[in-house]
Amino acid sequence: MANSSFKLEHPLERRQIESSRIREKYPDRIPVIVERAERSDVPNIDKKKYLVPADLTVGQFVYVVRKRIKLSAEKAIFVFVKNTLPPTAAMMSAIYDENKDEDGFLYMTYSGENTFGLV
């Protein structure tokens, strides 16, 4: 996820300050950045930054992403963390603890196909 446009648009120090401010104000929430994978055929998401309840599952968050991009029911969507498909039943808090970036955000990429081939 090195090509994150969010990372390119905002310097590391500003991202660190923002994520720690968010975590202090909302300790039961996870700061997540969601971006579409390059060369993906699914629509772009209308907003990249999410404050996700810590007890939400990955599957529930994928449902939120589907609704935001208005993806039809017959189309598949895959959400990746560090180029890996996280377990659908995993809690977002566990995914955050294991995969958060040095700036304090969890970066997720979505695609209409299993672009990385890792399950």
Curated annotation (Swiss-Prot):
Query: What does the tissue specificity note say?
Result: Constitutively expressed.
- Would you tell me the protein name for this molecule? Autophagy-related protein 8c
Query: Which species is this record about?
Result: Arabidopsis thaliana
Question: Has the keyword Transport been applied to this entry?
Answer: yes
Site positions (Cleavage): G117, L118
- Protein's job: Ubiquitin-like modifier involved in autophagosomes formation. May mediate the delivery of the autophagosomes to the vacuole via the microtubule cytoskeleton.
Propeptide section residues: 118-119
Give a GO biological-process term.
autophagy
Per the record, lipidation of type Phosphatidylethanolamine amidated glycine is found at G117
Query: How does the record say this protein sits in the membrane?
Result: Lipid-anchor
